[in-house]
Amino acid sequence: MAIHADTHDDLRLFQTGEHACGYWSDRQARDLVLDPHDPRLGAIYPQALAWGFRRSGDLVYRPHCERCRACVPVRIAVAAFHPDRSQRRCLARNQDLVVRVVAAERTDEQLALYRHYLKHRHPGGGMDEHGATEFDQFLIGGWSHGRFLEIREPAIAHLPGRLLAVAVTDVTGHALSAVYTFYTPEAAARSLGTFAILQQIQWAQRERRAHLYLGYWIDGHAKMNYKRRFSALEAYDGRHWRGLPAHASVD
C-alpha cells in the first residue's frame, strides 16, 4: 500500500496482523505502519501527525481495525485553549513544582520512576518488566526529535528535588506531540497527568506552535475521558480536523 506525500516518491505502508486490543479486552486490533526503513521518516513525521499517525519508538502508526473505528486522533489548538476551573485548580495546586525541558536521554532516575510507574499501572502485563533497553526503544527511538518535560519537587539545599513525572514529547516545526507520560503513583492528589498536559500546552504556546497532539481518544472509554476535558480540542475524521466541544471536568 502507498500514499502520496508530496515528495519524490510515495510512502509505503504496512498493515500488521491482528493483535489484542490495548483498550478493549474483547476486541482485536491492527495498525497501518509507515515503512520503518524509509530514510525520510523523521522528515515525514510532522505530516504523519496531521494524518492521524502516532509514534511508538521508531514506528509511526495509526489504528486500522477491520470492524472498529473507535480510536479518533485528537489535538489541541493551543492558541485557543483556556483552562477550565478544575484545570486552574490543578495549576494552582502544583505551583510549587519545578518544570523543565531536557534532552531525551535516559537517566537512572527517570528509568527508576518509569519502572515504578509500570509496576503500579500495568502489573503482570509485560511492560512492568521493562528495563533500560525497552525504555530507549519505546520512548526515545533512533530518529525522533524528542524532549523530556521533567516535573520535580522544589530543590533542597541546591540539590534537585525529587522527580515526580516525565512527559515524553516530540517536537516538530509547528506542533508538539505527547508521546507518553509516567509519574509517581503516590502523588495521585496532584493530578500529574493533567498537569503535564497543561505544561505541554504552555510550552507550545511559548514557542508559538499551533498544536499539541494527544494521540487517540475513544468515546465511552473511561481511561480516555480526560482528553475531552480540554478546550480547543480537534478530532481527525480521516480527511479533516474538526472541533470537539469540551466535556466538563469533575473535581
From Swiss-Prot:
- One Pfam match, given by its short name, reads ATE_N
Which Gene Ontology terms of cellular component type are present?
cytoplasm
Q: Which UniProt keywords apply?
A: Acyltransferase, Cytoplasm, Transferase
Say yes or no: keyword Electron transport present.
no
Q: What is its main location?
A: cytoplasm
Biological process terms in GO annotation:
ubiquitin-dependent protein catabolic process via the N-end rule pathway
Establish whether keyword Signal is in the entry.
no
State the EC number(s). 2.3.2.29
Domain of life according to the entry: Bacteria
Question: What family name appears in the similarity comment?
Answer: Belongs to the R-transferase family. Bpt subfamily.
For this protein, the record's NCBIfam families field holds:
PRK01305.1-1, PRK01305.1-3, PRK01305.2-3
Q: What is this protein called?
A: Aspartate/glutamate leucyltransferase
Q: Which organism is it from?
A: Xanthomonas euvesicatoria pv. vesicatoria (strain 85-10) (Xanthomonas campestris pv. vesicatoria)
What taxonomic ancestry is recorded?
Bacteria, Pseudomonadati, Pseudomonadota, Gammaproteobacteria, Lysobacterales
Q: Which gene encodes it?
A: bpt
